[in-house]
Amino acid sequence: NRTYKVKAETGQSYTTPLVVMKEGKEVIITFGSDHLTAHTAEDGKLLWDCGGYNPGDKAMWRVIASPSISKDIVVVPYGRKGYFAAVKAEGEGDITKTNRLWTKDVGADVPSPIAHGDKAYLITDRGHIYCFDLESGDQIWDQKLPRSSASYYSSPIISGQRMVLAREDGVVMVMKLLEGGFELLSENKMNERLIASPIPIDNRLYLRGQKHLFCLGG
């Protein structure tokens, strides 16, 4: 049974919410196209609201890429490849003017970014990877993956200093993250269309293809 109901902002949001712990309680952070909001998991109470993600106030302003969080900073891609922003996830009420840390004129429509440690990584649909300082927003590096006619729809994952990213045409790439870029370690052909994001569980990597579920590892 549904425990509570919170008013939906829009029907044009396809993002996945974040679940974090704050003072021993679960908090749900969700991106609803125009606003980033935080709610208590227990009763849905609105804790804070950060707006400004629909600059032109358009009626049909859908979002697909999900937010990511590290060190209480949420990174948000929005504007259909237009923008990438960071917000300090704390406070009460409207935190739009007080907690927005930075905004960049680069974004991703489908792949979700990763906030990892003190860095934020953004991957565009065409395989251009950007690395930013999480707190200041300073760009540390950017580098392109091998050129291909296929796009990137799945979101990357990071384990240690390795990033794993699947391309639409079934090529799974493993990269070593460096201070000034990345080293491409391998390109693995699954021979099947891949759109879903890879999932790591117990030292194994699961990939859902168009026809099969793959499990990699030992």
Residue ranges and their predicted role:
Residues 73, 82-84, 105-180:
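Loop/turn-rich, solvent-exposed surfaces of beta-rich toroidal or solenoidal domains
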Residues 169-171, 192-218:
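Blade-level signature of beta-propeller repeat domains, shared across WD40, Kelch, NHL, RCC1
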Residues 38-43, 47, 78, 84-85, ...:
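Beta-rich carbohydrate-recognition and catalytic domains
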Residues 1, 45, 138, 181-183, ...:
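Residue-level signal for well-ordered, solvent-exposed loop/turn and beta-edge residues enriched
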Residues 41-44, 84-95, 134-135, 174-181, ...:
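Short loop/turn segments immediately following beta-strands, especially the blade-tip
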Residues 23, 32-34, 80, 126, ...:
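Residue-level signature of beta-propeller blades and closely related beta-rich strand-turn architectures
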Residues 1-25, 49-70, 77-80, 99-114, ...:
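Extracytoplasmic beta-rich repeat domains
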